[in-house]
């Protein structure tokens, strides 16, 4: 198979108690994922940058009782290029790594840093990128001690990026690869988000497969989901409105959109088969069985065919 394991995500919030968590874990377990990707911010296990011991005990017991394997997705707001709160950003990442260790997760996904125009104007881009590299090396040391791999994820052109209020170098997967190559740490790799890359290719006009191919040797984890490759430039926040027009990061099951997933994966020369999280929007929770089946079918088809060089 193209992937060593195929799982899915649990992105619903459970910060007000734990009502529904055990039931949702059981529903996911019945769908047969190899793992479930959980978000510490949605489980309420981090408070002020540190693990909340009481909350961790409650949530951790439920996660372990479900007898599932896990990966972890760091809070979305973690930004290792934010020099104004750099210590706190590193604390949240490190707490996420320790949370992963507690629940037996081997992969921790972290978004690449972003430059916020108004806040970061007094810092050069290179200073910010250097700060991110240093933070990732430091976190990589901790990850290595804990037996965890950090996978840094590429992003997509959401509205603040399109407007120029935020600059995110990782919308070009090849630039993310350059940064992670420069980090040069065995516990730090890339999470290739295929849906994000497809949206970025459609908006910026780069070659989708070529850009993704630049990351292949560093990919440790994949976020696999589908969309219609149409950037959302409207101000409408409701996901239901985006779906009607097929806009933005829809997080559909593989095959429901227009991304050439099979073609891409046939051209990706992974040095080792990465884990694959079929990352669906919370509104599509009921489609997890379909999504897992589709991802496994793609993986089998790709593995059965001769790879195609880029």
Give, region by region, the residue ranges found by the protein language model.
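Short, basic/glycine-rich phosphate-binding loops at helix/coil junctions
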Residues: 70, 156-157, 241-246
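Histidine-acidic metal/acid-base catalytic patches
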Residues: 1-5, 14, 18-30, 106, ...
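Hydrophobic residues in well-ordered beta-strands that form the structural core
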Residues: 72, 150-152, 192, 278
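Active-site-proximal loop/turn and secondary-structure-junction residues that shape catalytic pockets
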Residues: 12-14, 40-44, 76-78, 112-116, ...
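Flexible, glycine- and charge-enriched loops at secondary-structure boundaries
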Residues: 21, 49-52, 86, 90, ...
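Active-site acidic/histidine proton-transfer and metal-coordination neighborhood
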Residues: 62-65, 82-189
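N-terminal pre-domain/capping segments
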Residues: 1-105, 189-191, 296-310
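Hydrophobic residues within beta-strands of alpha/beta enzymes
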Residues: 36-38, 108, 150, 222, ...
């Amino acid at each position: 198979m193209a992937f060593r394991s195929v799982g899915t995500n649990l992105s619903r919030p459970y910060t007000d108690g734990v009502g529904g968590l055990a039931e949702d874990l059981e529903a996911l377990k019945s769908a047969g994922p190899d793992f479930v990707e959980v978000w510490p911010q949605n489980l309420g296990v981090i408070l002020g940058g540190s693990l909340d011991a009481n909350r961790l005990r409650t949530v951790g017991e439920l996660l372990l009782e479900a007898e599932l394997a896990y990966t972890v997705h760091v809070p979305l707001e973690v930004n290792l290029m934010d020099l104004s709160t750099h210590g706190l950003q590193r604390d949240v990442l490190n707490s996420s790594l320790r949370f992963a260790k507690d629940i037996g997760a081997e992969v921790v996904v972290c978004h690449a840093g972003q430059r916020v125009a108004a806040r970061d104007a007094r810092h050069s881009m290179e200073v910010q990128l250097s700060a991110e590299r240093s933070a990732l090396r430091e976190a990589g040391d901790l990850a290595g001690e804990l037996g965890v791999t950090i996978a840094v994820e590429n992003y997509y052109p959401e509205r603040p990026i399109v407007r120029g209020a935020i600059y995110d170098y990782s919308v070009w997967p090849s630039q993310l690869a350059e940064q992670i190559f420069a980090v040069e740490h065995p516990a730090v790799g890339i999470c290739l988000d295929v849906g994000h890359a497809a949206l970025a290719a459609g908006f910026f006009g780069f070659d989708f497969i070529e850009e993704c191919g630049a990351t292949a040797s560093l990919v440790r984890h994949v976020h696999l989901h589908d969309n219609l490759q149409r950037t959302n430039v409207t101000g409408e926040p409701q996901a239901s409105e985006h779906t009607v027009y097929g806009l933005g990061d829809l997080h559909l099951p593989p095959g429901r959109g227009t991304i050439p997933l099979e073609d891409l994966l046939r051209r990706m020369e992974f040095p080792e088969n990465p884990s694959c999280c079929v990352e669906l929007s919370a509104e599509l929770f009921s489609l997890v069985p379909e999504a897992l089946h589709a991802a496994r079918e793609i993986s089998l088809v790709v593995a059965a065919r001769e790879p195609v060089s880029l």
